């Protein structure tokens, strides 16, 4: 097996058990490499979260690589074929937590930047890195706090490439040029607890709310558009009752989520839900939490640079997509930056025996380098 710079750095990062919000010196490893390439290093720690802001250059335009060093928990170690934090290459496949999501992309970003700077020491504009250890967790003290800090000092990005694993069947076949918004709610329906044999003395919140819940499930919220699928409503949890078979519950809690397109706003969705609940005469409380606005980067400089780089390196004609969950791109896009996500295959992310093709690592670094060349050389 031929070793590569990208593989070696990937292994170094993957050996560090950086389960969110831990960083385990992953950012220090990256920062050391970047400092040698002329980057100014700034560590931003908020509560228990480590963040790295590194920048080479002081001028516009600014190209930023963004990503996260934290990983999700491993689950039952007995189910892994090898230690998730002792990465192994078997038959050309790199196994370990963070292989796909997203330590190999971090390594590729660093290597691409080193190579680009060596060839173009006087490149135009600036190259930056925004790296957090709070992407897989609550995302409270990570990218969003760094962005707030940068905004306060009027430090802007022009383009941002998030190294999330975007590919589906082969490297570069999909890049995410946007994401849907995410709106969560915990709805509590109030009834009156009682004995099941005396229903006239109780008010069953399950029965009371069933028609309204059915209506919410059947509602067409919008038709989507050329960039986004239609808004989806999904119930994730329902809880009611004491566990006893002879007690009518006093309350029922329903947790649900909207993944919404740019055709509606979070406020419009809230209003429509409240209208349904009130029309059905329910006594309720509802608590909303907003995880992120939808964002879209239309075809332009960044998308064109990425699609051309992918075609040059892999021969693949990439497709643009806004599917999938949220990413930290949702915190960066509102600054006005063009944002897209481009990384390795995502089939094994968050799973037992997470893995990535070793053969994809150097091409990913090449793609990142060619994007830099088109925008900053």
Swiss-Prot record:
Keyword list, A-Z: Amino-acid biosynthesis, Cobalt, Diaminopimelate biosynthesis, Hydrolase, Lysine biosynthesis, Metal-binding, Zinc
Query: Which terms does the record give in the GO molecular function aspect?
Result: acetylornithine deacetylase activity; cobalt ion binding; succinyl-diaminopimelate desuccinylase activity; zinc ion binding
Q: What is its EC number?
A: 3.5.1.18
Annotated positions binding Zn(2+) 1: 68, 101, 164
Which InterPro entries would you find in this protein's record?
Answer: Bact_exopeptidase_dim_dom, DapE_proteobac, Peptidase_M20, Peptidase_M20_dimer, Peptidase_M20A
Please tell me which top-level EC class this enzyme sits in. Answer: hydrolase
Where do the catalytic residues lie?
A: 70, 135
Q: How is the cofactor bound?
A: Binds 2 Zn(2+) or Co(2+) ions per subunit.
Please list the reactions this protein catalyses.
Answer: N-succinyl-(2S,6S)-2,6-diaminopimelate + H2O = (2S,6S)-2,6-diaminopimelate + succinate
Report the pathway entry: Amino-acid biosynthesis; L-lysine biosynthesis via DAP pathway; LL-2,6-diaminopimelate from (S)-tetrahydrodipicolinate (succinylase route): step 3/3
| Chain positions recorded as Zn(2+) 2 binding sites | 101, 136, 350
Q: Which GO terms describe its biological process?
A: diaminopimelate biosynthetic process; L-arginine biosynthetic process; lysine biosynthetic process via diaminopimelate
Transmembrane helix among the record's keywords? no
Q: What cofactor does this one take?
A: Zn(2+); Co(2+)
Q: Does the keyword Hydrolase apply?
A: yes
Q: Which PANTHER family did the record assign?
A: ACETYLORNITHINE DEACETYLASE (PTHR43808), N-ACETYL-L-CITRULLINE DEACETYLASE (PTHR43808:SF31)
In which family does this protein belong, per the annotation? Belongs to the peptidase M20A family. DapE subfamily.
> Its function?
Catalyzes the hydrolysis of N-succinyl-L,L-diaminopimelic acid (SDAP), forming succinate and LL-2,6-diaminopimelate (DAP), an intermediate involved in the bacterial biosynthesis of lysine and meso-diaminopimelic acid, an essential component of bacterial cell walls.
On subunit structure and binding partners, the annotation says: Homodimer.
Protein name per Swiss-Prot or TrEMBL:
Succinyl-diaminopimelate desuccinylase
């Amino acid at each position: 097996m031929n070793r590569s710079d990208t593989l070696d750095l990937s292994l170094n990062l993957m050996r560090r058990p950086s389960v969110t919000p831990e960083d385990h010196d992953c950012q220090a490893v990256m920062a050391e490499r970047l400092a040698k390439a002329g980057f100014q290093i700034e560590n931003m720690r908020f509560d228990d979260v480590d963040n790295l802001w590194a920048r080479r250059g002081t001028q516009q335009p600014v190209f930023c690589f963004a990503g996260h060093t934290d990983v999700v928990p491993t689950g039952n170690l007995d189910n892994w074929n090898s230690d998730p934090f002792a990465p192994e290459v078997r038959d050309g496949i790199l196994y370990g937590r963070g292989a796909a999501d997203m330590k190999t992309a971090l390594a590729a970003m660093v290597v691409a930047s080193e190579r680009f700077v060596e060839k173009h020491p006087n490149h135009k504009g600036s190259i930056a890195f925004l790296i957090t250890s709070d992407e897989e967790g609550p995302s409270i003290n990570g990218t969003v706090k760094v962005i707030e800090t940068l905004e306060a000092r009027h430090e802007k990005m022009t383009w941002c490439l998030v190294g999330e694993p975007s590919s589906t069947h082969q490297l570069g076949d999909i890049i995410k040029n946007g994401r849907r918004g995410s709106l969560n709610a915990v709805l509590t329906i109030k009834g009156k607890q009682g004995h099941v044999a005396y229903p006239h003395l109780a008010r069953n919140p399950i029965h009371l709310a069933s028609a309204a819940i059915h209506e919410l499930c059947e509602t067409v919220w919008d038709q989507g558009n050329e960039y986004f699928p239609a808004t989806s409503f999904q119930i994730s949890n329902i809880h009611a009752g004491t566990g006893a078979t002879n007690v009518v519950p006093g309350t029922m809690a329903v947790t649900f989520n909207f993944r919404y397109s740019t055709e509606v706003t979070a406020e419009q969705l809230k209003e429509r839900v409240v209208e349904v609940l009130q029309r059905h005469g329910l006594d309720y409380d509802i608590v909303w939490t907003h995880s992120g606005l939808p964002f879209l980067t239309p075809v332009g400089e960044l998308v064109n640079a990425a699609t051309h780089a992918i075609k040059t390196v892999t021969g693949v004609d990439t497709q643009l997509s806004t599917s999938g969950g949220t990413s930290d791109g949702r915190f960066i896009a509102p600054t006005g930056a063009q944002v897209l996500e481009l990384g390795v295959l995502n089939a094994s992310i968050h799973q037992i025996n997470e893995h990535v093709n070793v053969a994809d690592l150097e091409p990913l670094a090449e793609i990142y380098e060619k994007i830099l060349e088109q925008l900053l050389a």
